[in-house]
């Protein structure tokens, strides 16, 4: 049998599937990182050797800021391409939820490089809002406030808005709307209000239950009507500027996204027809990362669509709904934090110990009068070739089962099981 090659490692670990050209195996058999296509690669083995010379030992977390920059550009270009294709004339805003990765260096890099791509930040609590206000000083950048809201959280957001920040308070419970109305009246400010709508559509994958009718957050249809009635009575209809939905993280099936977008588009149409001039539709997170490189929906670690397909469906759904109802196109907000940051860091740690499967020594002979099952298994291994590989594997499995049955009945010695095991494993 031939020796193991670099190509075999690339195929085994499917690095070309999940690496997205950021990660590859170089000619030395080492993992290489290429932050941008066409730029210089970093050999991780050589990098770690250099760090050890400097007395830096593993575990080490390596960050590649250029990958963050490239991911921002990738998503932005996908929206531009979709806008050109479907006639989308409004704006797209990319929002980074800092809960995804709160490391200062990460958030600063995203804010710095993302200025020309309408990058904003999302806060899910008062402490996160403090961090967002401190790190993102661009007055044209959007700040989305989600999560549980108490009086202090709402007051901080409204005071920041009074200072010129573009802040949107997204209502997830009816009592939050009343709280926002009371505090804004006291501070004499017209708040930018968003409403999170609880869609019937749900996502797919590990976080499927976080969306749909069973979701903990958002207003259902009856609660939405109650909220709209409250805004009308409070003469705050002009304050409702955003609707938001989120059907789960790491969505594996594009069909679920299509259904949610279709449903959300109708909510936008209905609100416009009721006299609420919503300017933004926040489609939330959910854009998946293909961790295993299979590009399938059968695994929670993958998804069956590309970023471009996700963006195309998002843009086309809203453009189509607006065209049919003669309505202005809304600005689209996305909160795809996972897709932005997943590839940019690598954790390198020391391998403490390894285990290996027993392998048949090619120089070893079976000896005289071997058991017929062992002899047959040896012949399968000795005569194995590529065209009959699967057939040989099936034959080996059958012999293995027969050997275990005989061993269980006391008709086969442990020594024979010992001989047959490395021969079978060699076939793998």
Residue locations for each model-derived region?
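Single conserved hydrophobic/aromatic residue that forms the stacking wall/gate
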Residues: 417-428
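Low-complexity, highly charged intrinsically disordered N-terminal segments
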Residues: 26-39, 45-102
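Phosphate/diphosphate-binding loops
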Residues: 172-175, 307-318, 331-334, 370-374
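N-terminal basic/disordered segments at the start of proteins
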Residues: 2-37
């Amino acid at each position: 049998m031939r020796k193991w090659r670099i190509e075999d490692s690339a195929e085994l670990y499917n690095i070309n599937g999940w690496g997205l050209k950021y990660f590859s195996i170089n000619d030395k058999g080492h993992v290489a990182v290429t932050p941008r296509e066409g730029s210089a690669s970093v050999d991780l083995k050589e990098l770690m050797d250099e760090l050890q010379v400097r007395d830096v030992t593993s575990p080490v977390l390596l960050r590649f800021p250029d990958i963050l920059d490239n991911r921002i550009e990738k998503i932005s270009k996908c929206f531009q391409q979709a806008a050109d294709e479907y006639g989308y004339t409004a704006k797209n805003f990319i929002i980074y939820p800092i809960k995804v990765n709160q490391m200062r260096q990460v958030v600063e890099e995203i804010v710095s490089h993302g200025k020309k791509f309408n990058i904003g930040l999302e806060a899910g609590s008062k402490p996160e809002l403090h961090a967002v206000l401190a790190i993102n000083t661009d007055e044209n950048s959007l700040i989305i406030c989600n999560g549980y809201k108490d009086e202090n959280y709402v007051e901080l957001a409204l005071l920041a808005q009074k200072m010129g920040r573009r802040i949107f308070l997204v209502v997830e419970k009816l009592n939050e709307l009343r709280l926002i109305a009371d505090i804004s009246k006291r501070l004499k400010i017209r708040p930018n209000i968003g409403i999170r709508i609880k869609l019937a559509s749900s996502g797919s994958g590990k976080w499927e239950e976080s969306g749909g009718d069973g979701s903990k957050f958002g207003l259902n249809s009856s609660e939405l009507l109650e909220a709209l009635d409250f805004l009308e009575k409070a003469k705050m209809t002009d304050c409702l500027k955003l609707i938001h939905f989120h059907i789960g993280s790491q969505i594996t099936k594009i069909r679920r996204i299509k259904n949610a977008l279709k449903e959300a588009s109708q909510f936008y149409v209905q609100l416009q027809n009721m006299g609420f001039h919503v300017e933004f539709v926040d489609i939330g997170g959910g854009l998946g990362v293909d961790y295993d490189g299979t590009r399938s929906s059968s695994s929670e670690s993958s998804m069956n669509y590309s970023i471009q397909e996700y963006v195309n469906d998002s843009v086309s759904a809203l453009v189509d709904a607006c065209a049919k109802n003669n309505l202005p196109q809304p600005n689209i907000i996305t909160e795809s934090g996972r897709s932005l940051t997943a590839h940019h860091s690598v954790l390198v740690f020391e391998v403490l110990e390894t285990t290996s499967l027993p392998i048949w020594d090619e120089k070893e002979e079976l000896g005289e009068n071997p058991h017929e099952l062992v002899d047959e298994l040896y012949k399968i291994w000795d005569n194995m070739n590529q065209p009959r590989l699967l057939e040989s594997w099936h034959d080996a499995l059958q012999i293995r089962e027969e050997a275990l049955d005989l061993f269980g009945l006391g008709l086969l010695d442990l020594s024979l099981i010992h001989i047959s095991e490395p021969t079978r494993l060699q076939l793998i």
